[in-house]
């Protein structure tokens, strides 16, 4: 079994890896891929980690707030790996920025800046001190009735009324077609969703990797790993080697549910190469 974690180049990712290991993954089964890394080949699961903001141009908007911190290389990486996961039939789990990227890739939109565009009395960016504890509670999550009886949906329902951490200033505005909300914050911002049927695709807006010592939070990673193991077993571990279609490395072009998204990401990458986002970005890394 091979699980790929998509992450920023400068972002410490030991927390995400540690959460997967705590849930039962083996060290050799987890591979971290950052912008510019070689083609990871075929894989059995994809975890889209936190990071900088998703570019508004990818969901049809012009940048409208000075608080944006963009990382076009990461946008291109996430959408390419997500496309590969769709082609492979591999489970996908998004966390914070990962939730936002999945929503955009499937046709949804985002609030560019919650404090200025959607202030409703709940702070979603509580970790303003880089030395603050990453498990600091911000607000509770409210589970929503879901048609799915999936293991992931059950894990989210079990978190009803639980306090979670929060380190983001963007959020889901229009949920993409085919996605079902599983939980929301007290101000009704979507905090978790999944795509029922057609394989495992799920995401949360908070950072459960910092809360994995809590049994109910670890259950989210266990549900993801269970789906990854099923995929690996069905494919004889990792299936055929993945051949990217037109570009070298992880910036491969594979057909997206929303094809214009990757084209825009790649155009943004070539037009504005720039350095990776700093570690103090809007979705503060672990």
Residue ranges, per PLM feature:
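The feature captures the ABC ATPase H-loop/switch
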Residues: 99
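N-terminal beta1-alpha1 cap of cysteine-dependent amidohydrolase-like domains
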Residues: 1-93, 103-111, 115-163, 169, ...
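Conserved G/P- and acidic residue-centered "switch" motifs that form tight phosphate/ATP-binding loops
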Residues: 96
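Active-site-proximal beta-strand elements of phosphoester/diester hydrolases
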Residues: 202-205
């Amino acid at each position: 079994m091979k699980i790929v974690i998509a992450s920023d180049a400068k972002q410490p990712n030991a927390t995400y890896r540690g959460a997967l290991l705590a849930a039962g993954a083996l060290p050799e089964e987890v591979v971290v891929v950052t912008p510019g890394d070689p083609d990871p080949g075929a894989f059995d699961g994809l975890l889209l980690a936190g990071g900088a903001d998703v570019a508004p141009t990818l969901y049809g908007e012009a940048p409208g707030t000075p608080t944006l911190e963009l990382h076009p290389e990461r946008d291109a990486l996430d959408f390419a790996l997500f496309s590969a996961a769709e082609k492979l039939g591999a489970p996908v789990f998004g966390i914070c920025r990962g939730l936002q990227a999945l929503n955009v890739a499937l046709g949804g939109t985002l609030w560019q800046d919650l404090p200025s565009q959607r202030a409703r009395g709940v702070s979603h960016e509580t970790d303003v001190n880089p030395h603050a504890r990453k498990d600091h509670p911000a607000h509770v999550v409210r589970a929503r009735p879901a048609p799915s009886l999936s293991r992931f949906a059950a894990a989210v329902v079990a978190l009803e009324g639980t306090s979670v951490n929060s380190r983001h200033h963007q959020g889901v505005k229009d949920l993409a077609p085919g996605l079902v909300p599983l939980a929301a914050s007290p101000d009704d911002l979507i905090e978790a969703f999944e795509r029922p049927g057609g394989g495992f695709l799920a995401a949360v807006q908070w950072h459960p990797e910092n809360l994995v010592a809590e049994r109910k939070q670890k259950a989210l990673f266990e549900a993801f790993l269970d789906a990854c193991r099923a995929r690996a077993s069905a494919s004889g571990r990792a299936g055929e080697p993945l051949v990217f279609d037109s570009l070298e490395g992880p910036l491969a072009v594979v057909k997206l549910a929303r094809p214009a998204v990757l084209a825009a990401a790649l155009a943004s990458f070539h037009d504005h190469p720039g350095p990776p986002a700093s570690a103090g970005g809007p979705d503060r890394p672990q």
